[in-house]
């Protein structure tokens, strides 16, 4: 068992409450809102950090209908998939998934519940807001997020009746239909909602062997129900939510590396179409109890996922059905009171994940490789995060997290008739901390500094590999240093930060695709600057602009990739959009024009597969025809810019996945109330 300590951070987080409580002044107490992001608006963790919050109308205006489209509205975030939607590649501030398909660098939360890694890319249903927190968040969130947190908050049912239907069509015979109804079942006591969604995003890739010409897309069906028991004049409430999502996809579709404008897949003669079906069931029980000084929240959540996946790989046909089960429990307590000198959050967290994989690699005339594997992972954690308001302008924050991680694996199989197998268990302990300080230079201008640690747990490879023992990889750990500022008035919002992140024991996949193994690849350093601003230059009009420059490299003492760039991290990025409202006698018109620039980046640790700089231009025009009817048209990627989203070496040649190109669509929404 190995204990990792960084005493200045951990001890600072432990000692700060005692120091602060010793000097707590006698002040009037009043209610302090604890948001879905687990922070009060006055806490250091809410203010001494780089963050972006996007509302539901902003998501709709930008055409964000799934989590992999969030980079359109969350500056600095990059999301693609490596092969298909099961395996997301995420980077933020130079911290990258780096081909670690089963453990993204940024954790996705939905209503306080961390999602399965294979469910990170999902359609969005009835979203109220999305928040991005940059940098490690392990002393505030139960699941230690190394690079940051994406926190999706959905609309909760209350006494206000809501309901609408949506429908739309777009390029490549794609369409979207949605129904939502929410409101009181018994006003003052019980509330409920239901959401149904059908979302089809077909592709246009061609398999010459089968004649299929719509490959590369997804078709999702989703249902969600919520109940909220919240008696009037009572300090408690309870909630229940259940959802089911089934998605069919044909995304394991590749073209030749230099054929990014082509539509014919790079396949062996006679290869079948790629196919994947993913079904995910989720259930959540939640409770909240409020006293004069504290608010207590309890969440217990379960997710069950199974998927089947078949795709051609060279001369082999691969079948990889997999089952996942995850349950999460979290208890959190937070202080209340606007005038408190000390604000605190304490939490206990448990996560248990179980996985079973069956895989078969078949040659045209005989089986080549088959295996069955079982893996488990469990995390037990306790965390605290607090703020000491030294004056009305100066505060310091600190936090500490203790984690105990356990994992196990057991697998067996045969390769060309030769059996193999092994099993193993491992456990590890981590102590993480964070410290921050912030000062209000004026009523509108704040400067801050922050130091925080993050990690990805130790564990075992999910996919068994013949000839290799069950050897665990160790935890990947990082420390982030940040200096930032935020300025906000009624007309202008500006935030900027410079940061440095050092990561050691990086977890990186290597080897042939389909048979890759995860191991520790050494150390990496990421440095960068980021800026985002919004100017509301006229009533109903705003201009957004953002940019970042990042240098993320493996250090010279990294065993495999010394001096190379970390995969999936663009060297720079930028974006700008103009949004407006034009009042006419026939209803308001809402134009939007947005451009996004993504810098060069690599898809592999060897830095052999490089995607160059590209830019896309999106436009939309909404029309509020009546109080309850909205019609919008949009053109995404107006100039049909084609670029690679993922690539790998297939033998001696490289293949790539490419984006879908220009998409034109029209959507209509009708509100019931």
Curated annotation (Swiss-Prot):
Subcellular location: Cell outer membrane
An example Gene Ontology molecular-function term: siderophore-iron transmembrane transporter activity
Membrane topology summary: Multi-pass membrane protein
GO annotations of cellular component type: cell outer membrane
Domain spans labelled TBDR beta-barrel: 160-672
Motif extent (TonB C-terminal box): 657-673
Domain TBDR plug: 41-155
Signal peptide start and end residues: 1-22
Pfam family, one: TonB_dep_Rec_b-barrel
Sequence motif: TonB box, positions: 30-37
Keywords annotated in UniProt: Cell outer membrane, Ion transport, Iron, Iron transport, Membrane, Receptor, Signal, TonB box, Transmembrane, Transmembrane beta strand, Transport
Function: Receptor for the bacteriocin pesticin and for the siderophore yersiniabactin.
Family to which this protein belongs: Belongs to the TonB-dependent receptor family.
Annotated protein name in UniProt: Pesticin receptor
